[in-house]
């Protein structure tokens, strides 16, 4: 299916179609299942924490599942990509179950789950891509253990930074703006002043 789409609209068209489909599917599913999401119990120790009481939480469940479906449909089938998609869903589910729980999970439980996800992601990357690093005109190889440690630190820190920014709910708007802003720059030969004047 993707090959026939590529022959008709090209890679840019397939990328645009995947982007629009993910957006439309997420918007549709969010409007359909918004009332089914867990609701905030209020944050006892946060400034104005009571104001968040009752707002829907856990929209990452909808967001990530839609992204995963579109990714599996539009990306070439590779075991590596499937593993990353499963890890993305696992990371989302840990946050969702924490949001849905009557009493929030403690930091150690969330940290261990995130750490395990980071290790599996690091091992997956290194097993499929090796330990070589290419940066501009330089190329070098890192020892497996050092590279794995750096990957685990990066992923584990990234997951926790997302949690600190109110989860994927708080992060998704800024990511969407950056993605939408980057798309025309990535797929055209226009300079930024030309795009701004359009």
For the regions a protein language model found, what residue spans apply to each?
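"…together with the soluble PPM/PP2C metallo-phosphatase catalytic core" -> "…together
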Residues: 2-190, 197
